[in-house]
Amino acid sequence: MSEAEARPSNFIRQIIDEDLASGKHTSVHTRFPPEPNGYLHIGHAKSICLNFGIAEDYQGQCNLRFDDTNPVKEDVEFVESIKRDVEWLGFTWSGDVRYSSDYFDQLYQYAVELINKGLAYVDELTPEQMREYRGTLTAPGKNSPYRDRSVEENLVLFEKMRAGGFAEGTACLRAKIDMASPFIVMRDPVLYRIKFAEHHQSGNKWCIYPMYDFTHCISDALEGITHSLCTLEFQDNRRLYDWVLDNISIDCHPRQYEFSRLNLEYTIMSKRKLNQLVTEKVVEGWDDPRMPTISGLRRRGYTAASIREFCRRIGVTKQDNNVEMMSLESCIRDDLNEHAPRAMAVLDPIKVVIENRAAGEEWLTMPNHPNNPEMGSRQVPFDSEIYIDRADFREEANKQYKRLVLGKEVRLRNAYVIKAERVEKDAEGNVTTLYCSYDAETLNKDPADGRKVKGVIHWVSVAHALPAEIRLYDRLFNVPNPAAAEDFLSTINPESLVIRQGFVEPSLADAVSDKTYQFEREGYFCADSRYSRPGALVFNRTVGLRDTWAAKATQ
């Protein structure tokens, strides 16, 4: 991460400052503990920036630990993608990658300790019965008939669970806390369940797997985590976090702190719903550029710096709030406006023939960035036949239209002034070719007679233009809060992807996916990492030059 990125201030950092000042802790140790059951999204980026950013700023450590306690939903594919995402965002974890499964032997022994203390029991209620016994927010639960088994019987039954002596769903290990607790999470929560599934790390060694709430706190303690940072939905779980650590023989007792999760407009963060988009082929995959996944944003052309800046701007609080999509888009625009080289691309081409110019190429020098000479320049060919965008020509127009009009002039970007003389149309009345004249004395300068030419349009040489598929990506949903809809799929934006067949200038022949360009007057684009290759270019629109949704919202 760049040292130039400002160090933020928030309530968590204030707590850390107080802990260090009081001597409660002499160093800071955080962790990022994703479950490897899907791809990380922009909400995870907030947690990554918080945990790794704190470790960096306080010269501490941050572990990457996979919460891999459910072998049915997890996959090595997700493990590898998460590691790539963390590294791409610019962070380095401390030591080796860790897995909760590394601690399965110790977790089992801690479960046995709770049984020996009379604080855990093997329950044989069915899942349906367990839900019924749990009670509701307004009604207390009731004790399982298996709750008062002896320590000896529970030890035998728990070992039987481990040995595969029970079928899935017929037995589990539960903590013995309080079925009348006002907090449902404390009503004898399940600590271990049976799953006959091969684990991507431990293989077939285990057929019982610890639950998240039991695993999380013990893993934190075993790793010496000082500040365990979670989103607000785990606030009630902190009671169970503390209960487990208070009742086992372990020296370290980390403290859990909660912050608000990221709610971003015009998208969804639910991993289940994101998976539904993928499995029902609403999108191409987890890295579809319309997805809020880090891999999707990366493929779309977002930079790691822009995502870090977004996380810095939205901050860390305890209050839930909805963040406008324009806040994220503003971060990438600011970044790319400063760093993206310029190029010309015509998305909806119309051919222009310059009749008073002899055929033959002329190579024009153009800056790669108008405000940064250090980015150098490039050579762009100009010829007597060029493409311009269809939207940049009208046969008739009012004075507010500053582009090319029949009988009037416009300037070609970094080139000459041209005048529209006549048009050629097809049988349907569509303009197919525009015939123009040019002023040979106006290369990057005003006409000698002082006449004013106000408009500037982009172009590419027909003889040198490279065909390209241009994918115009937009927001995936057409309402700010699709998660609130009865059927979130009904709010899909039908224009979230529009494909154009256009032309780009020859300097983009070898465009690579990790480099984003400003297509002048069109927006920011990058070569698609999956499909683009020399001779078959595919460009994804990262973001437009300005926010068009704000205008739509006021209409």
UniProtKB/Swiss-Prot annotation:
It is found in: Cytoplasm. Gene3D superfamilies: Glutamyl-trna Synthetase, Domain 2, Glutamyl-tRNA Synthetase, Domain 3, HUPs, Ribosomal Protein L25, Chain P. The gene is glnS. Pfam families: tRNA-synt_1c, tRNA-synt_1c_C, tRNA-synt_1c_C2. Its main location: cytoplasm. It is an enzyme of class 6 (ligase). CDD domains: GlnRS_core. One of its GO terms (molecular function) is glutamine-tRNA ligase activity. ATP binds at residues 35-37, 41-47, 231, 261-262, 269-271. PROSITE patterns: AA_TRNA_LIGASE_I (PS00178). Its EC number is 6.1.1.18. Belongs to the class-I aminoacyl-tRNA synthetase family. This is Glutamine--tRNA ligase. GO terms for cellular component: cytosol. L-glutamine binds at D67, Y212.
